[in-house]
Amino acid sequence: MVFRALLPYSRQIRQAIGNRRVVLKPNNVSIDIPLCATHADTLEGILEFLKSIKKLDNVVIAESAANGPTLDGFSNYGYFRLARKYPVKFIDLDKEKYEILHVFDEKDFRPHPVRFSSVLLSPDSY
């Protein structure tokens, strides 16, 4: 289903990616409750789409799980099986470099420091 949903936008997505690395950022709120995570089949649909537009040569799946070790979540949800079929790498964003940026809270209108992954902030990432 994801593959078919992306197909009408193939040209635009291919052009937008250009020569950049593709970062797939699933949402893993929990590392052991499947309903709190992006399903591996969803990621596979995206990977198949990227393959169809010849943008599968530099893809990473990157996450920072909310309640435990990210790689445990990847294992629990079957993400690692994707590496047997696609040339994808896995990144635990908690173990990568980060930048501190300040965001404003509407309750107190004060800046609060927040860690942002350098992987996600990189202009070389899409």
Segments from the language model and where they lie:
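N-terminal and secondary-structure boundary signal
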Residues: M1-Y126
